[in-house]
Structure formats: C-alpha cells, structure tokens
C-alpha cells in the first residue's frame, strides 16, 4: 500500500484528525478474477478490454495457473502476447486512453462549497484546506464571498470542470513553487488560462490564512 501526502501532512500529525480504523472495511480491489472464474474461462487475456471501459480483468499470482501471464517492458498486444506490430501496439495505447476517461468517473469527487451568487472561486488541494477555510470566514465578515473546491484526485472529475465554468475568476492556492495544480487545470481541463490566478506559498512555512 502506497500512501501519498504533501509534506505538511506528512511531517505534522496535528494537521489531520486521528485515524479510526473500521474492522469491517473491505477494500474494493476492482476487476480481480477468482480461481473459479479463471477456471471457467477458455483463455485468460490480461490486456483484453471486455467491458469497453479500458480496464481489463486481472489476476493475483498463485490464484490459478490459467490466470498467469507474461509481462515485459516492450510491446504486447491486447491478448498479452509479444508484438512488434505497430497497429497492435497502438491498440493497447488507445485502450489506456479509454481507461483514463473511465478513471475520471471513479476517482474521489472534490469537496465543494458553492453559491450561485459568487463570481469568484478558490481551488486548492491537501493541507491548504484549513488556511483557506479560515480565510473565507474572515473575508465573509468583510462581505467578500468566494466559492471553494478542494481537489481530491486526478484526473479531474466533471465537478472540477463545472466549477471552472461557473466562475469568472479562479484563485488556485497551492504550496508548490511551479504551480503544478494551476498547470494541470490549464492543460487538462477546458478553461481560459486568463481565468486562473496562481497563489503559491513555497518558503517552507506552513500556509496560513493571511
């Protein structure tokens, strides 16, 4: 299990609430075939897009000999066989694009605070959240209201695109020198770059509301 977080959360456990583990939790491992399912198949093809969503079924090593497959760093076709055929290679790469579009419907949706009366919005990520919520409270007392969207995953979901469409200007707040979140929004979403105003704090001090 790989747990990815930004530096502030990784180094300061006061940034988040204590984890409460649910013993009843069962992870959704996706399209994993059981030994019985593999046995009932005529042939298992690791990279075959059966459902049309770009996500092939997979097996866990040791489940069933029929579910084994050979993987390599160079080209393979949709059936898992080695190939140097250009059309077969492109077929696999095109399937990955379908998988990418499907992922947009499966990743966690953003947290959104929205009012139709607000023309400006804030988009941010990770440990910027508390500082932004505090800043919005302060600004609200000054009759300056901004909507807020906290990104939780990439690729961006349709909710992110709608938030971009619904505002005249978006302030993208992040603790990153290069403004990576801003660049991803401009390159991956349909948005006029002039609408994006990048606000970056990257001097090593945790972000604060001022």
What does each model-found stretch correspond to?
Residues 1-210:
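Flexible, low-complexity linker and terminal segments
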């Amino acid at each position: 299990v790989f747990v990815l977080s930004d530096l502030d959360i990784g180094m300061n456990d006061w940034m988040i609430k204590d984890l409460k583990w649910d013993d009843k939790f069962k992870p959704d491992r996706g399209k994993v075939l059981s030994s019985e399912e593999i046995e009932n198949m005529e042939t298992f093809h690791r990279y075959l897009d059966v459902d049309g969503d770009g996500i092939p079924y997979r097996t866990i090593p040791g489940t069933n000999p029929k579910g084994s497959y050979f993987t390599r760093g160079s080209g393979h076709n949709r059936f898992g066989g080695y190939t140097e055929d250009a059309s077969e290679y492109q077929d696999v790469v095109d399937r990955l694009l379908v998988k990418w579009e499907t992922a947009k419907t499966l990743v966690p949706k953003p947290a959104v605070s929205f009012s139709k009366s607000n023309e400006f919005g804030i988009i941010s990520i990770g440990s910027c959240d508390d500082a932004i919520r505090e800043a919005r409270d302060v600004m609200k007392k000054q009759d300056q209201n901004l909507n807020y969207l906290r990104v939780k995953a990439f690729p961006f979901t349709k909710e992110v695109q709608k938030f971009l469409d619904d505002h005249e200007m978006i302030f993208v707040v992040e603790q990153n020198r290069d403004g990576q979140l801003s660049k991803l929004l401009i390159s991956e979403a349909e948005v006029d770059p002039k609408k994006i105003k990048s606000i970056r704090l990257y001097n090593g001090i945790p972000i604060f509301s001022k």
